[in-house]
Amino acid sequence: MNRKIETAIVVAPRIWKSSKNYHNSVEEISLLISTLGVKVKGVVEQKINTINPTYFIGSGKAKQVIEQAKMLGVDYIIFDEDLSPVQTKNFQKLNKDIKLLDRPGVILEIFFRNAKSKESKTQVELARLQY
């Protein structure tokens, strides 16, 4: 039985004043994504001075990311950052067909997919709801 390989596009904003090692971060999120069995089809880099409260990145770039994701036919748009609930909701309003995850969401998904017992799945689901 052939299972379709899920695919993703990674959005990797680079905040100018951040001390975070950008290239290591992109490499790390790609490894986390591969742990899910998801293949990365592309990385969208964006230099930003400040975090946009609506989409994290600018609205034009958000629309561009969605168009690129549709062109590539990916299953996920994954941010290499933590999105606020408002940013997640706004991004999902722009696109309802492609699943959206941020860095903590990827980690929670890894835990969920690897949970074996009913109790562990419940624990992960509670963590998701709290997040």
Positions of the model-derived regions?
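N-terminal accessory targeting/assembly segments
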Residues: 1-109
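Extended, highly charged alpha-helical segments
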Residues: 104-131
